[in-house]
Design a protein with these regions (language model features):
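Short, acidic, metal-binding catalytic loop of nucleotide-sugar glycosyltransferases
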Residues: 7-19
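A conserved acidic beta->alpha catalytic loop
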Residues: 23-37
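Glycine-rich, basic loop-to-helix element that forms the pyrophosphate-binding segment
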Residues: 52-68
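Short aromatic/hydrophobic "clamp" motif used to bind/position activated sugar donors
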Residues: 73
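Conserved donor NDP-sugar-binding/catalytic core segment of glycosyltransferases
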Residues: 81, 85-127
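A short, conserved alpha-helix in the catalytic core of glycosyltransferases
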Residues: 89-91, 153-155, 161-164, 170-196
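A recurrent flexible, glycine/aromatic-enriched loop bordering the glycosyltransferase active site
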Residues: 134-156, 215
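Terminal low-complexity segments of carbohydrate-biosynthetic enzymes
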Residues: 148-152, 210-269
Length: 269
């Protein structure tokens, strides 16, 4: 139950701004985890739990853009811990950039507490678009710098300037490039702030929802079509060529059809 440690570590180890709200978006409220979340919330006045039952997806975290009350949103997966000084450095950045449309994150800190990945490179690999990368020189300088994309286990926006996110996603996959491009289309960039190191638990046997390849492919098509509007856009053509080499043609066609149906686009098979 990672959210317990994420929340309590924030409360114990960080100087939080006044009127901080812990908004928990629970996509499995009837589970044991869901019941434990509500039990803990009784002990934390500043915690608010919202059940999200209209869809099961990792994308529900972006519902915070219209559900949160604060001016600054810090979105975290429920199994992320923040390095000392994270909150102070984040709030200082926003104090200097109060009207920014940027998405801000920092280097992913691996479990050895030494290795980091401060960005993802926009290339196809395996079943994902994005490969972890590390620009040690930029991190060492300590200044904010633009990156093409980053993992979405930890991110921050000025709430009023966050981009509009599609609600047509289901399951897991497709977030990183989508959120980076949405930010750019909205007039911002993706910024890495080297002081914002975050540790993410990857190896955990129990999941809220299964990782299904079909769902991931559908999500990528929902994402790219929402971004670019046309299967003939070069990014969509490249994606189709890639998936054609990964899955049977009929399976890919079904995934494309489902994505276009969700978006209300005509499909010609």
């Amino acid at each position: 139950m990672g959210f317990f440690f994420s929340v309590q570590s924030l409360r114990l180890h960080h100087k939080l701004p006044p009127n901080t709200e812990f908004l928990i978006l629970d996509n499995n409220p009837e589970s044991d985890h869901g019941r434990q979340i509500k039990h803990l919330a009784k002990s934390i006045p500043e915690m608010r739990v919202v059940d999200v039952v209209d869809r099961t997806s990792s994308f529900i975290k972006y519902d915070a853009f219209h559900l949160a009350k604060g001016d600054v949103i810090l979105g975290l997966d429920c199994h992320v811990l923040l390095a000392p000084g994270f909150i102070d450095n984040l709030m200082e950045y926003w104090s200097w950039n109060p009207n920014s449309k940027n998405m801000v994150s920092g280097p992913l800190l691996y479990d050895n507490m030494v290795s980091t990945s401060d960005l993802m490179r926009p290339v196809w690999n395996g079943h994902d678009f994005g490969v972890w990368g590390d620009d040690k020189g930029a991190v060492a300088k300590g200044d904010p710098y633009e990156v093409p994309m980053q993992g979405m286990g930890c991110f921050s926006f000025i709430r009023k300037n966050a981009p509009k996110i599609s609600d047509k996603f289901s399951g897991f996959g497709g977030e990183e490039w989508y959120m980076a491009e949405k930010t750019r289309q909205n007039g911002g960039v993706v910024v890495c702030l080297p002081q914002l190191k975050w540790n993410h638990r990857f190896d955990w046997p129990k999941r809220t929802f299964p990782l299904v390849l079909h769902d991931k492919i559908v999500n990528y098509y929902v994402a790219f079509l929402d971004l670019y509007g046309d299967l003939m856009h070069p990014a969509c053509v490249e994606m189709t060529q890639y998936w054609n080499a990964q899955v049977p043609t009929d399976d890919l066609g079904n995934a494309i059809r489902e994505a276009m149906t969700r978006l209300g686009l005509p499909f010609v098979g």
